[in-house]
Amino acid sequence: MAAAAAAGSGTPREEEAPGGEAAASQAQAPTSAPGGVRLSRLPLARVKALVKADPDVTLAGQEAIFILARAAELFVETIAKDAYCCAQQGKRKTLQRRDLDNAIEAVDEFAFLEGTLD
């Protein structure tokens, strides 16, 4: 009866797990959206392996791995767009290493990368 009352009240009801915990507390980061669209282009297992390669990391939650993967995607997208703009200035469509160097020098947010490609 309580399930019917909760369903009819218009408020979402948390499912009880066998241990008595709510299912929402056991939720993991989604890897795909409804309809089969992947939310992360990077393989989460590979990202997790990279994170765990750091000796300072003992535990890495699935949500943290997903957020790191998404942040890496956005970073690569941003630097690639800036490097592509440098390639277009040279009337080229193909990115070259010098385009990345120019993007790193031109954008303040990439200052931490200066000298890393040497």
From Swiss-Prot:
The modification Phosphothreonine is found at T11. It is found in: Nucleus. Pfam families: CBFD_NFYB_HMF (PF00808). One of its GO terms (cellular component) is epsilon DNA polymerase complex. The modification N-acetylalanine is found at A2. The keyword NAD does not apply. Residues 1-37 are annotated as: Disordered. Keywords: Acetylation, DNA-binding, Nucleus, Phosphoprotein. Its main location: nucleus. The modification Phosphoserine is found at S25. One of its GO terms (biological process) is DNA-templated DNA replication. It comes from the Eukaryota. One of its GO terms (molecular function) is DNA binding. Residues 1-11, 19-35 have a biased composition (Low complexity). Accessory component of the DNA polymerase epsilon complex. Participates in DNA repair and in chromosomal DNA replication. Component of the DNA polymerase epsilon complex consisting of four subunits: the catalytic subunit POLE and the accessory subunits POLE2, POLE3 and POLE4. Interaction with POLE3 is a prerequisite for further binding with POLE and POLE2. This is DNA polymerase epsilon subunit 4. It comes from Mus musculus.
